[in-house]
């Protein structure tokens, strides 16, 4: 029974009642009989509509073709979801190249994309700033997963600026991103168990590629002389990278770009550059470069030349279709840029 037919039944019942009234069949006995019949018809109509509505609510809300619709906050998460999901998923990323997730505010369009998804993936650990409350609210009624949720807290770095409890930039340690990949794998299987075998196979292949990348980064960073193995960026996003690959990391701002910095922070970092003879600093694709330019100018005024070693991708990946537009390509680009500037 369709909703249209239900509405027609309502109309037919009304017309029958009206016709009989015109025919003079309006005795109390007749009215009681007609009332009983009307109630029975209404119950049948409502029960039919309820059954239909229940069937719609309980069925998978996949798009035509049976693909699982996934909305992910960051490009890194979206890329991992595509790798694991393969041909069975359609992935929409909210934050594109150059977007700072710490300062990001969801638009009405973003809310629609989240609402239309069968599965929502976000980083967690307060990376997404004000969007965190939206995710927590949606998780009460939808399939929403924080991909960092299964990482052992002992492997997480504490936030030194007090903005969050933990440093959310987990993707800079490839071994932690392997954990995230497994969480995404489990989320896809739960949402779409019919394709479990394919999700497991895709995840196994991607995890093997990530393991190779992890070893590659270790080898390349080790080629930098230890005295010059210092990575200086606009904000402290590379802490996990430093811990995992044995390179000292310093950022002008704290873990979140929402953290403010002052003239003393600039002068302190400038003085350290000069005293240690550090020859390169790095700008980030998602953070304005003026802070690094101020430090370079300050060092130059003290007779020390510091170069911009290149642009690193920190909180967002590169353009779609480029090597840096994938997680593996982004990590490889960052590593090669760092090694070339500091070696």
Describe the residue ranges of each PLM region.
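Extracytoplasmic metal-acquisition and chelation regions
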Residues: 15-18, 35-38, 49-343
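Bacterial N-terminal signal peptides that target proteins for export
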Residues: 6-10, 14-37
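N-terminal acidic, proline/glycine-rich, low-complexity intrinsically disordered segments
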Residues: 1-5
């Amino acid at each position: 029974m369709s909703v249209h037919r239900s509405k027609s039944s309502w109309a037919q019942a009304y017309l029958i009642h009206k016709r009989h009234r015109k025919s003079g069949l309006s005795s109390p006995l007749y009215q009681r009989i007609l009332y009983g019949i009307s109630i029975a018809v209404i119950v049948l109509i409502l029960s039919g509509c309820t059954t239909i509505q229940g069937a719609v609510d309980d069925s998978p809300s996949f798009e035509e073709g049976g693909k699982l619709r996934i909305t992910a906050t960051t490009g890194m998460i979206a890329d991992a979801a595509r790798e694991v999901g393969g041909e069975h998923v359609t992935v929409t990323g909210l934050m594109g190249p150059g977007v700072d997730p710490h300062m990001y505010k969801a638009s009405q369009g973003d809310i629609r994309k989240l609402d239309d998804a069968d599965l929502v993936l976000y980083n967690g650990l307060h990376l997404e700033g004000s969007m965190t409350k939206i995710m927590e609210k949606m998780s009460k009624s939808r399939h929403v997963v924080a991909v960092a949720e299964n990482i052992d807290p002992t492997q997480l770095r504490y936030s030194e600026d007090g903005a969050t409890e933990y440093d959310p930039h987990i993707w800079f340690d490839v071994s932690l991103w392997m954990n995230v990949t497994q969480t995404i794998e489990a989320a896809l299987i739960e949402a779409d168990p019919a394709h479990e075998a394919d999700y497991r196979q895709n995840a196994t292949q991607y995890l093997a590629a990530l393991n190779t990348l992890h070893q590659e980064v270790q080898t390349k960073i080790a080629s930098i002389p230890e005295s010059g193995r210092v990575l200086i960026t606009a904000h402290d996003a590379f802490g996990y990278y430093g811990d995992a690959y044995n390179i000292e990391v310093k950022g002008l701002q704290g873990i979140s770009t929402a953290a403010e910095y002052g003239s003393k922070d600039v002068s302190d970092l400038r003085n350290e550059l000069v005293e240690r003879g550090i020859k390169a600093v790095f700008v980030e694709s998602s953070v304005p470069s003026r802070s690094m330019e101020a430090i370079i100018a300050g060092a130059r005024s003290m007779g020390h030349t510091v170069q911009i070693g290149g642009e690193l991708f920190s909180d967002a990946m590169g353009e779609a279709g480029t090597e840096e537009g994938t997680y593996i390509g982004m990590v490889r680009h960052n590593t090669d840029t760092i090694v070339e500037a500091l070696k």
